[in-house]
Amino acid sequence: SDCTLRNHDCTDDRHSCCRSKMFKDVCKCFYPSQAKKELCTCQQDKHL
């Protein structure tokens, strides 16, 4: 299955972010201003 690219929406599938040996992207959620529901995007994991 295709993975979700960095900065793309992963709200509906939070374990879909792309990863490789060099990096691991994680789905990070936030509430945009004025939004009633959260928005999640794949971001680079800061731990590596």
Swiss-Prot record:
This protein is called Toxin CSTX-14
Domain remark in the UniProt entry: The presence of a 'disulfide through disulfide knot' structurally defines this protein as a knottin.
Q: How does it assemble?
A: Heterodimer of A and B chains; disulfide-linked.
Q: Name one GO cellular component term.
A: extracellular region
Task: Describe tissue expression.
Answer: Expressed by the venom gland.
Where does the protein end up?
Secreted
List keywords of the entry alphabetically: Disulfide bond, Knottin, Secreted, Toxin
- The record lists the organism as Cupiennius salei (American wandering spider)
Q: Which GO terms describe its molecular function?
A: toxin activity
Similarity field: Belongs to the neurotoxin 19 (CSTX) family. 12 subfamily.
- How is the polypeptide modified once translated? Contains 4 disulfide bonds.
Give all cystine bridges in this chain.
C3-C18, C10-C27, C17-C42, C29-C40
